[in-house]
Every structure is written in structure tokens, then in C-alpha cells.
Amino acid sequence: MVRCRVRSPSERSHEVYRQQLHGQEQGHHGQEEQGLSPEHVEVYERTHGHSHYRRRHCSRRRLRRIHRQQHRSCRRRKRRSCRHRRRHRKGCRTRRRTCRRH
């Protein structure tokens, strides 16, 4: 599938910023005070909407969850296997001990 090149949000925001500067020079101070135009809102959503999403990856809560999952995942698997296969309970207990060392 071929896609045409779309400008990145950063390129677009610079272009809008330039337009605002030129508008102020010509004497259009009222438009900026009233609020964002539809075009500016679109740019604002693109540039600022994803910034929160990107920050989320580095949050301590998320890192802690990932860290916990690494340690608990093997224990969870063993517990589930025990529930389904009741015959092998003794083998599962010995496996759990080796699992906790990690």
C-alpha cells in the first residue's frame, strides 16, 4: 500500500506559529484572544493529544506492573496448571520453589 507523505505534527505547528506571527504584525490581535480557530484546534489536538500517551510509558505504576508480571507470571502458570491437572500437584510444588528463586 502506497501512502503519500503527510507532514508531522511538529512541522504543522511551526507553520501555524509562523502564520500567527504574520497575523499579529498585520494587526489581527483579536483572533488570538478569542480562542483557537478550527485549524489551530486540529494542530493542538495532534501535538498535545499524543504527548500524554507517550509519557504514560515511563510512569512508575506501569513499570511496576510490568516488573510484577515478570515475577508472578511463572507462578500464575503453575497455579493454573494445578487447577486443570490435579494429578500433578506434587510436581507443581517443587517447580514453584525453583520459580521463586528468580
UniProtKB/Swiss-Prot annotation:
Residues 1-102 are annotated as: Disordered. InterPro entries: PRM2. It is found in: Nucleus; Chromosome. The modification Phosphoserine is found at S8, S10, S37. One of its GO terms (biological process) is nucleus organization. One of its GO terms (molecular function) is DNA binding. Residues 49-102 have a biased composition (Basic residues). One of its GO terms (cellular component) is nucleosome. Proteolytic processing into mature chains is required for histone eviction during spermatogenesis. Transition proteins (TNP1 and TNP2) are required for processing. Testis. Belongs to the protamine P2 family. This is Protamine-2. It comes from Gorilla gorilla gorilla. The gene is PRM2.
